[in-house]
A protein has these predicted regions:
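Glycine-rich phosphate-binding loop and adjacent beta-alpha segment
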Residues: 174, 220-291, 325
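Adenosine-nucleotide cofactor-binding segment
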Residues: 148, 164-224, 272-276
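N-terminal glycine-rich beta->alpha transition that marks the start or flank
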Residues: 3-4, 14-19, 24-69
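A glycine-/small-residue-rich N-terminal strand-loop-strand element
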Residues: 69-93
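NAD(P)H dinucleotide-binding glycine-rich loop of Rossmann-like/cofactor-binding domains
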Residues: 89-150
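Hydrophobic/small residue at the entry helix of a nucleotide-binding pocket
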Residues: 155
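C-terminal hydrophobic helical "lid"/dimerization subdomain
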Residues: 2-4, 273-325
Length: 325
């Protein structure tokens, strides 16, 4: 390598998207267990908009980004999992809004040649979230009846496709006709509006209820989500897009049929390289087999990170938003 500096996008103050500005920084040197990666695609996520806006405190100046894919260009002295030239993806790097980034070898996986850079950059966070929900939190088997809220969203769209590949009957909720078309295209069996979804599911199941509900919406849906479960069904609350769920009396679960409730997070389901490799490996297999098709809605050059944040915050996306350095 001959480069000694790299272009990054960083913030020196928090605020509106225009605080994201390009800056030249020294090219980082990998530590003993790190690899240096030439960035090919960066996944943009809402947490970065919260960091930029000052909702979540970060040390300034700050280069955002954790999710990316690229080519290994240098390795640390103790690296054994990667070599120069390998294709890599991760959800656990730092400072990925840059032409190059560092990541520990334990927090990244090899990317098959058959997977595009865009898919590799779009997959890790939303893909592993969908995978741990349906494979580990409640393992879905053929014949299970499942509700996943927000079927036109990133996690919802991936989950629907994986659930159908497993032989589940999939119910989902959406907020508009346009989003209903997206969820239907993903393969959902029953696409419902949020208003009255519980009564509709009871009718569609003749009152029998569902095996599991995956709820990333939170405050606006959770209480009704509990009512659509069968006896000993499970509610998996994995997010709060509409706000956090208020505390409730656990005795309520008894009255609704001895229900189970859990509040998982991806960090606890991707704790080591073996687990990350298993999840990402199955996701890559699903792409290669045609069971999973990712939707990249919009791509932006690295220098247009501010525009990308504006686009994401408008909440009109129909898939993943990427930076392509």
């Amino acid at each position: 390598m001959t480069d000694t500096t790299m272009t990054t996008v960083h913030l020196e103050a928090t605020g509106a998207p225009d605080v994201l500005v390009a800056a030249q920084l020294p090219l980082p040197t990998p530590g003993s267990t790190q690899v240096l990666v030439k960035t090919r695609a960066v996944g943009i996520n809402f947490i970065e908009t919260y960091q930029r806006a000052g909702v979540y405190s970060v040390p300034l100046p700050f280069v955002p980004g954790t999710e990316a894919a690229g080519e290994v260009v240098a390795v640390g002295s103790d690296v054994t999992h990667f070599s120069v030239g390998d294709r890599l993806a991760t959800a656990n790097a730092t400072a990925t809004y840059a032409e190059y980034f560092l990541v520990d070898q334990e927090l990244a996986v090899q990317v098959p040649e058959s997977i595009s850079w865009e898919d590799a950059g779009a997959l890790p966070l939303q893909g592993m979230t969908a995978h741990y929900l349906i494979s580990s939190t409640f393992r879905v088997e053929p014949g299970h009846k499942v509700l996943i809220h927000a079927g036109a969203g990133g996690v919802g769209g991936i989950a629907i496709q994986l659930l159908k590949a497993r032989g589940a009957t999939v119910f989902t909720t959406v907020s508009s006709d346009e989003k209903a078309k997206i969820a239907t295209a993903h393969g959902a069996d029953h696409v419902l509006r949020y208003e009255g979804f519980a009564e509709n599911i009871k009718d569609l199941t003749d009152g029998a209820g569902l095996d599991v509900v995956y709820d990333g919406v939170g405050k606006d849906t959770f209480e009704q989500s509990l009512t659509v479960l069968k006896t000993r069904g499970m509610a998996v609350l994995f997010g709060g897009a509409s706000g956090q769920v208020a505390p409730f009396d656990l005795q309520k679960l008894n009255g609704l049929g001895s229900l189970y409730v859990t509040r998982p997070t991806l960090a606890h389901y991707s704790q080591d390289r073996q687990e990350i490799s298993w999840r990402m490996g199955e996701l890559f297999d699903a792409i290669e087999s045609g069971d999973l098709n990712l939707t990249v809605d919009q791509t932006f050059p690295l220098a247009q990170a501010a525009e990308a944040h504006t686009y994401l915050e408008a909440r009109k996306t129909r898939g993943k938003v990427l930076l392509l350095p």
